[in-house]
Amino acid sequence: MEGDGGVQLTQSPDSLTEEDVCVIQDTWKPVYAERDNAGVAVLVRFFTNFPSAKQYFEHFRELQDPAEMQQNAQLKEHGQRVLNALNTLVENLRDADKLNTIFNQMGKSHALRHKVDPVYFKILAGVILEVLVEAFPQCFSPAEVQSSWSKLMGILYWQMNRVYAEVGWENSKK
């Protein structure tokens, strides 16, 4: 998987099957056990490959060297936040109301407070998938695992775009 990891905008929230949910939750356990390292790996890859994303992060906007990024306390903290948010999604895949609340809070925060362009959710989703496949090959090598995770990332991106549209993102970024 490279680039956007096959993440599609058209993934609707109900596109995960029960099998997808089980696959995602089972393969997530070893990742979350290594969340500190995984979160840093995701953000270092994200900012190295897409340096324009750093514009939204004043605490590590100037970092260029991946080794320096790995040691940055604020980057580590944000990596934990990303993985914790993903963990909350994974834990609640069968609770549509809870997921809707999570997506609304995350989307509104990033649209209104942080003013993050929603395209970065698609980019970050692809980076997450790439890092998971590379760092956890025993779990993420099978095509069906990658397909299930790609659906989840597509749902995340779809939902963020939905929330951004609801809050009038086009008007708020001008």
UniProtKB/Swiss-Prot annotation:
What's this protein's family per the entry? Belongs to the globin family.
Subcellular localization is given as: Cytoplasm; Nucleus
Task: Report the Gene3D superfamilies cross-referenced here.
Answer: Globins
- Single annotated GO MF: oxygen binding
Gene that encodes it: cygb1
> Which CDD domains does UniProt cross-reference here?
Cygb
Catalytic activity, EC: 1.14.12.-, 1.7.-.-, 1.11.1.-, 1.15.1.1
Task: Fill in the subunit field for this protein.
Answer: Monomeric.
A biological process (GO) of this protein is: regulation of neural crest cell differentiation
Which keywords fit this entry according to its UniProt record? Cytoplasm, Heme, Iron, Metal-binding, Nucleus, Oxidoreductase
Residue span, Globin domain: 15-165
Give the signal sequence positions.
none
Q: Name one GO cellular component term.
A: nucleus
Pfam families cross-referenced by the UniProt entry? Globin
What is the protein name for this chain?
Cytoglobin-1
Expression by tissue, per the entry, reads: Expressed in all tissues examined with highest levels in brain, eye, gut and heart.
For the ligand (heme b), the binding residues are 78, 110
According to its UniProt entry, what is the function of this protein?
Probable multifunctional globin with a hexacoordinated heme iron required for the catalysis of various reactions depending on redox condition of the cell as well as oxygen availability. Has a nitric oxide dioxygenase (NOD) activity and is most probably involved in cell-mediated and oxygen-dependent nitric oxide consumption. Under normoxic conditions functions as a nitric oxide dioxygenase (NOD) but under hypoxic conditions the globin may switch its function to that of a nitrite (NO2) reductase (NiR), generating nitric oxide.
Query: Which reactions does this protein catalyse?
Result: Fe(II)-heme b-[protein] + nitric oxide + O2 = Fe(III)-heme b-[protein] + nitrate; Fe(III)-heme b-[protein] + nitric oxide + H2O = Fe(II)-heme b-[protein] + nitrite + 2 H(+); 2 superoxide + 2 H(+) = H2O2 + O2; H2O2 + AH2 = A + 2 H2O
